[in-house]
């Protein structure tokens, strides 16, 4: 090869006529076909499904009254998580306690920020699952 050219993923190389050179950029990487959709890993949801298959999903519904107090226990639905940890404790109960503790640790005045409440509960539930099981599930929190 009289004149080597260094190319990277996505570079379009012209070899002839004339001197070789990079002439354009093209899409590169993995492309997935999922059902009738073709796209990147993120576009077709493959990345999230991999995470779901590895660590499961937890949905938490929190209802606050007009004074921003907890109105009953939060509802928790766990999919793909074990029922109990190695000590035999119910993981959903551990996550419920963590959710309630997270809400109660926020001063009532700051509970008006529902995004703050949601993120606090999400982190607490995810942490409780990780302590009990060793994996961090995807956690979705609904606060009303």
What are these regions (language model features)?
Residues 1-144:
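Acidic/His-rich, metal-assisted hydrolase cores and their charged scaffolds
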